[in-house]
């Protein structure tokens, strides 16, 4: 699926490339992703814990990374905001997890995870606990509140993700109206 001239994944990669050339894409199975052409630092890895949902994917990405701190985002978020991501990375020292919180809702797939989370995530997965929020009780978390997010992304478009055809159509309309790329 494309939004503007790019696929959803290309839009995500474009926003992440300035942060690190080593971009890890976790997939449920071995997939060929032709939209990765031109992104030499992007590599595709297969989920170590298939069927374990988001938490398994986060574990796999962290296990494959050599970085102490890692931006973890969903591949279907076409409107990531680099300034907000940069702000979150800047907050990460001294925390295991930096995650946006809008009221009662947190965005675990738009967060900075320390590799220190690996052992905690592994224990959760081995116990069959798949809820990402369970990790929040085990690690030092810095919540990025709405008032902070609003300074960079007042429309909260960073958290828009494409799950349905209607979402895809809405993303295309947003891209035509508001977003340069």
Over which residues does each language-model region extend?
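Nucleotide and nucleotide-moiety/phosphate-recognizing core
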Residues: 1-129, 137-156, 169, 173-179
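A residue-level signal for conserved active-site and pocket-lining positions in enzyme catalytic cores
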Residues: 136, 164
